[in-house]
Amino acid sequence: MKKEKLASFIDHTALAPNIDVRSIVKLCEEARRYHFASVCVNPCFVSLCREELDGSGVKVCTVIGFPLGAVTSKNKADETTVAIENGADEVDMVINISSAIDNRFNNVETDISAVVDAARAAGKKVGRDIVVKVILETCFLSDKLIETCCLCAVRAGADFVKTSTGFAAPKDAEGKPLPNGATAHHINLMRKTVGKDFGVKASGGIRSAETLICMLEAGANRIGTSSGAKIYENWDESIIVKGRDN
């Protein structure tokens, strides 16, 4: 796969709470240099990224209701509107995870719809088509819940489903930490559920070319990673990614 093709899949990400302005500027410089799909940053950095990326073709992505998804739907909608007014092109929202676990899927869908509706309205005002990605936090959900939440996202009019925030801390019955990021199994399940024309984003724990390839081959068409520059710089263009136009 050519580096240019690789870059088109990557959301170059910096969401740590202690990230500084210098790091965000560097993130944008790397995204411009390598022509990544977007930078994904916390809402407070959206305006800065808009300025840094002006004219580059790189999108500005931010997060909504992040990382817990536990604020109200109105809070998420308002946050979405402000983010788009500040320059966001894409928003990655976290579902109400508690509602999903409780099988209150009307609440899950209504919550997603609130963000989608706000994004469409705000996008129309600023003259941009806004992409909405729905973070499921798959480490907390059974396969059946993942399937149902994917269908909620489709019905609500979103554009992508996404695996993880990367900030969850699941534990087993003995209190031992469990994996919290993307898995090939979950990506494959999500792709089969939403079909070929809907977006699937893998995020959380993707720090190597090997893991990135695994996610693409499982069905992801967007990758969220803070290691995008390292992966790009060390990429071997002779690599064949199955199921992709290399």
Q: What annotation goes with each model-predicted range?
A:
Residues 237:
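Conserved P-loop NTPase nucleotide-binding/switch module
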Residues 38-45:
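N-terminal low-complexity or amphipathic/hydrophobic leaders
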Residues 3-34, 46-200, 208-233, 241-246:
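Alpha/beta enzyme core
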